[in-house]
Amino acid sequence: EQRPTLVNLQCDIDHPTQIMADTAHIIKEFGGVENLKGKKIAMTWAYSPSYGKPLSVPQGAIGLFTRLGMEVVLAHPEGYEVMPEVEEIAKKQAEASGGSFRRTNDMKDAFKDADIVYPKSWAPFGAMEKRTKLYGENDHEGIKALEKVLLEENGKHKDWACTQEMMSLTKDGKALYLHCLPADITGVSCEEGEVDATVFDRYRIPLYKEASYKPYVIAAMIFLSKFKNPVETLKELERKELHIQTRFVRSRDF
């Protein structure tokens, strides 16, 4: 029976393909999933001229990294909270995995001695609830008024940026910088943004590697949904590939 596979590429709550790509990247960078236990990751809000970016990345990050025994710190200005249900899940998972989860309104506190930093903008959950309600009521004037308030509030936090000074607070000043891309780069894509150009350029190659995992994550999701015994199926495919390669080498010898 032919059955289509449904993959969640992103929703209001989570961004599973992105966060699993991030996870594959940090597993590679730190030499194995077992080496992530005890590592500190700072999932922090960062200023962007656009106030309404999705919450799915920070929520997905705290939802997955807390399962790996990591020290997860969620940092944002007051009023930029994520969904409370997601935070509760993160707390329970951190306790179960032997890691930790906490929230702070101090970006420097989050960056202090961090092994990994993930600074990006997102919209306040409470404001998005209001906006959804206004759209449902077709209240265009209410939407305009809300957007004005949100932009004014957003502009108060331009100091929440990933700068060289901020990176110097991390572990040995060499934390791994993550971003789901595209990033709002100060002086490049905007006047003031999430990250300084000097920081972004320093991590350009690792960022592209991070992004490159996503197609494989999506392919793995599809593969898992199509085969009852995915591990055995992969082993069989590997055996067949090895057999083909062996025959090819032998044919060349003749």
Q: Could you tell me what each predicted segment is?
A:
Residues 1-28, 185:
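Phosphate/diphosphate ligand-binding glycine-rich loop within oxidoreductases
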Residues 7-9, 40-46, 74-76, 148, ...:
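Short beta-strands and strand-loop turn motifs
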Residues 27-133, 137-141:
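Glycine-rich phosphate/diphosphate-binding loop of Rossmann-like nucleotide-binding domains
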Residues 35-37, 66, 165-174, 201-202:
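Short, conserved loop/helix-junction motifs that constitute active-site signature segments
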Residues 127-191:
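ADP-ribose/adenylate-binding Rossmann-like module
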Residues 170-254:
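Adenosine-phosphate binding glycine-rich loop
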